[in-house]
Each structure stands twice: as C-alpha cells, then as structure tokens.
C-alpha cells in the first residue's frame, strides 16, 4: 500500500500499518485512530492533517491533549511537518492572543477548553484532533466535555486518538463518538444510547448499581465502531516491535512482626467500615481510601499518630527492589520504576543516594515543562540509568526508552506500587515499548504475598475491576 500520489511524509518513513492508517484518515471525513501505545498515533494524525491542509482547503487545526504532552505535540509537528504550531498557555489574555496567531496548528489542553470557548469558537477550526480521548472525553456533563462536543460540531473534520477506546467505563463511548461524528454512530441522546446498549445490575448484595453492556448488542457496537475507526494492536505488528521478555512477578514475604502490623490495620479498617454503616453508606471512594493504608504498609511506611508518614523498621518490598536495582545497574542497563505514593519515591531516592546511583524523578508536583525536560534528559543521557516516576503523573505522553540502547540490551520497568486503575499500568508499560527502539523490554511487578498487593495484582491481571470486586463481594471477602 502507498500514500496518495504527490503526498509524502517528512523526516520519518512510515511502516505499512501507518500508511494504511493515514490513508484511512484521508478517506474518511472523521476517523478514530485506535493504535496501541507507542505505535505512532501522533505521526499518523499529523500527516492526515497535512494532507487536508494541502488538498482540502483546511488551514486551521486544533489539537486537544493532556497538559503534560502539549510540548511533545509541538515538537512532533515541527519535526515531521512543514508547518508551525502554537501552544495556547499563559494568562487568560495571553491565551486569547495566542489563539489569534496565524499558524496552521494550535495546541490546547482539555481543561482550558471551557474557559476559552468563545475565542476558540470564533477561530472556526477546520480540523479537531482529540488525543487520549478515552481518558478525557468521558461523562457528557463535565464542562470540558461539553466544550469539546460543541466545538466539534463546527469543525469540518475530527479525529479521535486513543490506544484504549473502551476502558472500564464503556458508557464513555457515547461522548467520544458524539465528538467524532456528531451522533451519527451512536445517536445524539446519551440516555437513549445507554438504554439501547446497556442494562443495570446490582453489585452483589450491596445497593450499588452499575450499567453493563448488553451482550446481544456487542456485535452491533463493534460494527458501528469500525465503521469510523481503524485499529492496530501490538499483536498484529509484533514483528516490528522490540522483543518483550516474559513478565516477572517478584513475590515478597512479610515476617511475623510486619504481618501482625498489617493484620491489625486490616482489622481496624474492617471495624471502621462496619461502624460507619458498611459498604452501602461509605461508597467505593471512601472504602478505597481506607484500603490505601494497607498498600502503604506493604510499600514500607505508615502514618503515625501526628499524621506524618514514617518508614517502617521492616521494608521487605523496598529491600527486594533495591536488590533488583543494584543487579540491573551492575549490568549497565537502564530501568524505569513506577510508584503510586510520593513517600515510596522518597524512600527509593534515599536508597539510591546511599549507593551513589544517579537518577531522575518525576511526580505530579512537576510542571509540564519540568516533566518534559526530565524525561527527555533521561532518554538522552547514558550516564543516568534510573528513572523514578509517579505513575499518574508520567504514565502518558512521554517516552522512556533509551535512544542509544542496542538490541543486545534490556530495558527494565519495575512496578513498586499499584494504582486502582489498570489502565494506568498499561499506559505506563508502553513508555518503554515503543516503535523503532532496539532493546528488549522486561517488566517486573513487586507483590507482597498474602496482602492487598496480591489481591490487586490478581484481580487486574484477570481483567477485573478492583472497585467492582470489592462492592460485589464486600471488603472482608476481597481481603481474605
């Protein structure tokens, strides 16, 4: 398959599946680009926009993306296209002036859409590109979703970019496709869509209810999705990706004292939940908030009577991680360590400092500019072998494979803490498994035996939702 006559890519030679994706986007007025992480969604979208600029009288493109990857988008546009890009940020007045700039591409983050709706509407963008749409265009009621849906109605062309179209909340399909084709695929009424394709169930004996897909409608849903979307996953093009070694699970055993501490906290949590009216009155958010205390114990710390976090005297999971770090470091290979908790990151940093091992760390406290500087520095600097990140802050939009790594090397990703949302883990895993890299990829999950770590790992690897499991069967059954 070839690109249209007279149209060529710049700087990068596309793979066959990318050519097919670009052609699909050119042939369809609106297109969902469903490529797994690291397969080049951005490159395909930019080239589809380039074609429309050159052939379809489209002059103004608005890229809507997470705040943390705005600079990455600008860099990609300027690298693989002949056009300039403007990032919309600064004071409210500065943002309005930036929208007026006469560049082909403008880049904005989702949360700014509602506040800048009027000047964006006045600009009359020809093409809208929604990156990471499954994470940011969800429930139809938030203002950012409302603004995105309205702006999409006045654009000539629209693109959705996501690696995971249907996450744990398939109801979000409606908002995404309402953006993509103004209701052509799934209708213009959310409640009609919900009642047509879903039905309500109760979770176990609790009073909580959840909408699930009607299995008799799955074939119809798939048919509608792929009438406007193109999909490539890693399995289809595995011969073009780096080799992924078997996933490891480092199982850590608590000694008697730590097990007693864990069990006491667990009993306290169960008593609190029972005292405060059980799962029905508390709700999943408050219950998960309590269970975090068990995660913190397995990670090696606890909150004391003054409300301060303190390191436990016994930290078997941290000890196992440090041992792994030393082994990888001695082999002169690189590693990415993902944590959920800031205190976990602090403990790891102290252990690395003791051993005089250089590292780069990234947390949610870093600005978008700081994050970009950090991951790019790690990627380019051979002397720094360790990257430590807070998974919710760095799981999307960054690339953490070493640019100079060879096919004889292994790039390691170590998961120290888990989040409740498995999508976060999948997104983070894709940061080192990218198209075009040469080194092998290895994942290792650190799991404390007979603890919440093990329950979370087993539940998520069985493709189940942790919160649903807890609300269906109760906290006590989940923990035992």
Regions found by a protein language model. Give the residues of each.
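Conserved helicase ATPase motor motifs in RecA-like P-loop NTPase domains
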Residues: 37-38, 155-170, 178
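Conserved Helicase C-terminal RecA-like lobe
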Residues: 1, 27, 39-40, 44-62, ...
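Conserved Walker A/P-loop ATP-binding site and its immediately adjacent core
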Residues: 44, 57-79, 167-172, 340-342
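Walker B catalytic acidic pair
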Residues: 131-132
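Conserved RecA-like P-loop NTPase helicase motor core
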Residues: 109, 358-455, 463
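Inter-lobe coupling linker of SF2 helicases/translocases
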Residues: 107-112, 118-122, 143-156, 160-161, ...
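Conserved helix-turn-beta segment of the N-terminal RecA-like "Helicase ATP-binding" lobe
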Residues: 69-92, 183
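Conserved pre-motif I regulatory segment
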Residues: 1-34
């Amino acid at each position: 398959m070839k690109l249209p006559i007279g149209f060529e890519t710049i700087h990068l030679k596309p793979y066959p599946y990318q050519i097919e994706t670009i052609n699909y986007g050119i042939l369809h007025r609106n297109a969902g680009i469903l490529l797994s992480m690291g397969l080049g969604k951005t490159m395909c979208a930019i080239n589809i926009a380039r074609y429309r600029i050159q052939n379809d009288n489209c002059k103004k493109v608005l890229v809507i993306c997470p705040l943390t990857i705005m600079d990455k988008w600008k860099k990609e546009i300027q690298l693989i296209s002949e056009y300039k890009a403007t990032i919309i940020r600064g004071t409210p007045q500065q943002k309005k002036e930036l929208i007026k700039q006469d560049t082909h591409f403008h880049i904005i983050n989702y949360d700014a859409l509602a506040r800048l709706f009027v000047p964006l509407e006045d600009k009359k963008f020809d093409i809208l590109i929604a990156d990471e749409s499954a994470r940011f265009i969800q429930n139809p009621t938030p203002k950012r979703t409302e603004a995105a849906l309205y702006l999409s109605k006045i654009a000539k062309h629209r693109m959705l970019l996501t690696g995971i179209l249907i996450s744990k909340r398939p109801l979000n399909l409606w908002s995404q496709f309402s953006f993509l084709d103004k209701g052509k695929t799934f209708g213009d009424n959310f409640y009609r869509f919900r009642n047509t394709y879903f039905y309500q169930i109760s979770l176990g004996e609790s009073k909580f209810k959840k909408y699930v897909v009607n299995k008799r409608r799955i074939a119809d849903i798939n048919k509608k999705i792929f009438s406007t979307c193109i999909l490539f996953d890693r399995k289809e093009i595995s011969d073009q990706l780096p080799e992924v070694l078997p996933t490891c699970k480092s199982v850590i055993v608590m000694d008697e004292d730590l097990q007693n501490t864990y069990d006491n906290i667990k009993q306290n949590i169960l008593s609190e939940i029972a005292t405060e009216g059980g799962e029905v009155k508390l709700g999943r958010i408050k219950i998960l908030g309590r269970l975090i205390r068990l995660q913190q114990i397995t990670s090696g710390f606890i909150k004391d009577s003054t409300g301060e976090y303190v390191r436990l005297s016994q930290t078997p999971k941290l000890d196992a991680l440090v041992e792994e770090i030393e082994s990888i470091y001695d082999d002169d290979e690189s590693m990415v360590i993902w944590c959920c908790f800031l205190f976990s990151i602090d403990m790891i940093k102290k252990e690395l400092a003791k051993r005089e091992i250089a590292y780069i760390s990234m947390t949610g406290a870093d600005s978008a500019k700081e994050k970009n500087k950090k991951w790019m520095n790690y990627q380019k600097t051979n002397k720094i072998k360790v990257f430590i990140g807070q998974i919710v802050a760095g799981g999307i939009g960054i690339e953490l494979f070493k640019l100079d790594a060879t096919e004889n090397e292994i790039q390691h990703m170590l998961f120290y803490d888990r989040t409740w949302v498995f999508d976060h883990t999948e997104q983070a895993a894709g940061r080192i498994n990218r198209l075009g890299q040469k080194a092998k990829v290895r994942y290792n999950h650190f799991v404390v035996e007979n603890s919440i770590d093990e329950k979370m790992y087993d539940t998520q690897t069985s493709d189940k939702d942790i919160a649903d499991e807890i609300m269906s069967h109760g906290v006590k059954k989940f923990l035992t």
